[in-house]
Amino acid sequence: VRAVAGEFRTSLAIYESCITDFQNVIYRNGAADFEVKPSEMDKVDYSRFSALITAGTVFAGQPSRDATFRAFQNARGAGIPVIFDIDYRPYSWPSAEIASEVLSRAGEESDMIVGNDEEFGFMAGDFKKGLNKARDLASSGNRLIIYKMGEEGAITLYNNEEIRTSIFP
């Protein structure tokens, strides 16, 4: 952990916990986590951990994008799995094209991916193709995928198997 000078700050998120008419407010402008540098990822002793867990928000800008991909390499070198929560937030990215390309790469370099139907659809370039994108990622690399569908439940994909579960109110 290091202090960052200037206008960088800790992010704020406010969520409602209701299924219908869900609202959220996330303030990410100038977030400090976007300032993590690749060289800082080399200072971590990955062998002390069981997994590397990250969210898609850190890929939206530099230098945190390169830093996170460096962390992926270092985790793989230490023999620990990479767990990736897609967490696509369009307002954080310079363009949808860059976001789709970068998040798809992150998915391909991960061992476990968690995302909702909209996020996988976004990565596929078409909402209707989201489940197929999740299936492709699961089958091309022995990945565990959690494909969330809101009040429709979720599908867990692994080793050409699919397990459907409903929500737990």
Question: What do these predicted ranges mean?
Answer:
Residues V1-T54:
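Conserved N-terminal subdomain of the carbohydrate kinase-like
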Residues E97-F122, E162:
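Structural recognition of alpha->loop->beta junctions
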Residues V82-F84, V114:
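Hydrophobic beta-strand scaffold residues
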Residues R65-A71, A96-S104, D126-A134:
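Charged helix-capping and loop-helix junction motifs
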Residues D45-S47, A106-G107, S139:
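A short, aliphatic-rich alpha-helical micro-motif
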Residues Q73-G77, D126-P169:
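Conserved phosphate-binding/catalytic region of the ribokinase-like
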Residues N29, T57, D87-Y91, E118-E119, ...:
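Active-site beta-loop-alpha junctions enriched in small/polar residues
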